[in-house]
Amino acid sequence: MNLLQKNLWLLLFASLSAGNLAHADEYTGLSPFEKAELERLLELDFRDLGRVPIRSVLGYEIEYWRNPASVHVIRPDDVSLNGHVLMVDSFRNVAGMYVTRGVGYDDFVTMRNFSGSATEKFLTLVDGREVLQRMGGTINWTTEDIPLAILDRVEVIRGAGASIWGTNAVSGVVNVVTKHAASTQGNSVRLLAEHDGTFLGEYVHGGQISEDSYYRFWLRAQEYSEGELISGIPARDDGFARKAGFRYDKILGSDLDFTFAGGFATRRVEHVMDLSSRLLYPLDANFTSFVPVSIATSLGLPNLPDPAVDYPSWPSSIGFTFPTPIPRIDNYEDMPQDGSHLRAKLSGVTDNDLEWSLSGYAELYDTTLGHIGHSWERKEFDLDFKANRPISDSHHLAFGIAARHMSFDVNDVATDPWIFPTFDSSTGSLRTDIPILDYGDSPTKFDRFTGFIQDSIDLTDQVVLSMGAKFEDSDLSGSTVQPGARFSYSFDDRNIFWGAYSRAYRQPSLVEKYTKVSYARVWDPSNGIWVNTFFESASDLNDERMDAYELGWRMRTSADLLIELSLYHYDTKDAVFSGPPIYSTSDVETTGGELTFDYRASDTWHLKGGYSFSRGKKDGEIQVDFPESMANLSSHLKIRDNLIFSKNIYYTDDRIIPSAYNEIPIDDYLRLDLGLVWRPKDNWEIGLFGRDLLDPDHPENMYNDLDVEPGKVERTFLLSISKDF
């Protein structure tokens, strides 16, 4: 029996056994988990019933509460009622996820510690399409975001998902699922405006072509207003983003469906390169310690370079850096980004209950990081087959195979400040064209072939065991096997205990593996020349290997209260850390957990919250670049049937933003967001929100050694107006 049939039977049972949910406790035979699921099902449109399960870590769809994993589900109301603009903002309400803002257009997301400020060590998919940028190992959250009207859910699976999802699903998986075109019929509009001029507008139109085929298209425009850095100077982070997309769904037969979809995104902003400590003067004859040339000048050291002759293209200083007072020198350049993709999917169910899907993806991504003179175009083609089948009432098998081809066209140039004669030891000559990043003749074409199998068995009515492995052969990593095992034990109809082990791998980014980095230039006072300093690419970098151990307990004391506890320990070998003078690898251990609750105190009051703790050790030393403790609390109170008072509180522990020369401490902070949401009609929603109300501003994050300092995350007031279908 598939999940749609199970949901329909559950609704039929409810209608026959009770008149309404006020008598839910009289539902004989339903556990508190099932009662809570029933309440949610009755609130859904009938067309959405087939899309309520979670894809899970077992390779087939099961109800959320049966998953032997730490899972958090974000739905559209979790975005709109909490005053979030983008999907990534809603991750702040997920225990264990650390979401920060740099300047106005930069969002950073870390899951369960140890991924650095920019590099993502969890896997993100949008309708099955991996969105990790392989060049730098990052995700552009603006480019990958989607209109709220087409969002069905975001499944946040904390913990390694190696045996199903494979490489890069190290600390977890974010699985974004959009709605079927049949569920987006008509017109939808969403407008958001902040008091500082930041704006977002979305339009979605859906229609029906025939009895069995549906379509939609959508448009989005986003404007960024200019903010300030923590020193008070302009952040130069204004700009814009534009997006468009479409989807076509057709029912080819009673058990055969076809989907064709695509999208385009463009963004135009500026980004900075910190030059404050890039020209160095040696303090000893062996060139082992240095100070910036600007400091050497103020100290009156001998044989200094002449700015007008030896580095005439270098920008002038504009004040001082913070907190270390070094003369501030920076260079802003354009950072255009364009991306487009197409997706086709054929799916069905055979007569012997084999549920299968065949998906194809094509993607073109073009970006220029003008501030470091690095640009690339990526073409990618993917083919993915997945299937699952119940072998018996107590035995379920999932399996799949996939292939990928990627090609890159990389171009590196010297940016304007660096165009002055410098000795390059790798060529033995003076050059004026040394780029910051040099991909050189490194490989530009990569193939990957993968397969997985997952076997889930009900050993008893209470115990479920699932074991599987992902097999991969790729040009980036060679051949790997990523095994995993999960079990769940139902004490009774209110308590589920689960555990898991996974061996997960993360591939180094192409910058880490293949790119030479010229990070500074040193003045040689004896010879009167600049000498380029660099660290070579690390083509011999191995994949990061992580053994993940997890335990969890899920308790639903009633249909109104869900409590979850998740504990984990990660043991990572060859974790990649970059910085002068080399790319280095370290052993990292991370231990932590999350405690969450979801409580419907009454028909008018809904509370959600969570606390997370995570402590990491790098080569035995405690890491300080990640907050050990974080907490969030969300409250939605219906003042009237159509008026909701929203309150969100977030606590984040202190941390230090690492840097090669200028570490920046970030104090712990408490954030309060308040909002009123009015729903004058069923499909209209008007919200007014105040965010970060406790402080006028605070810093959160920045790109290490690229940004000079973090931007201010300021108190903002937001007006949102939306009309649903």
What kind of feature is each model-predicted range?
Residues S163, N175, A182-T184, L192, ...:
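Periplasmic-side early beta-strands and strand-to-turn transitions of outer-membrane beta-barrels
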Residues E130-R158:
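Short acidic/polar hinge/loop motifs at secondary-structure boundaries
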Residues P53-H72, V88-E130:
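Extracytoplasmic beta-strand/coil segments of soluble accessory domains associated
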Residues I251-T266, D310, W314-G319, D330-S477, ...:
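Face-selective signature of the C-terminal outer-membrane beta-barrel domain
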Residues D353-T368, S490, I496-W498, T533, ...:
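Membrane-embedded beta-barrel scaffold of Gram-negative outer-membrane proteins
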Residues E26-L41, F46, G50-N82, F108, ...:
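N-terminal periplasmic "start-of-domain" segments of outer-membrane beta-barrel proteins
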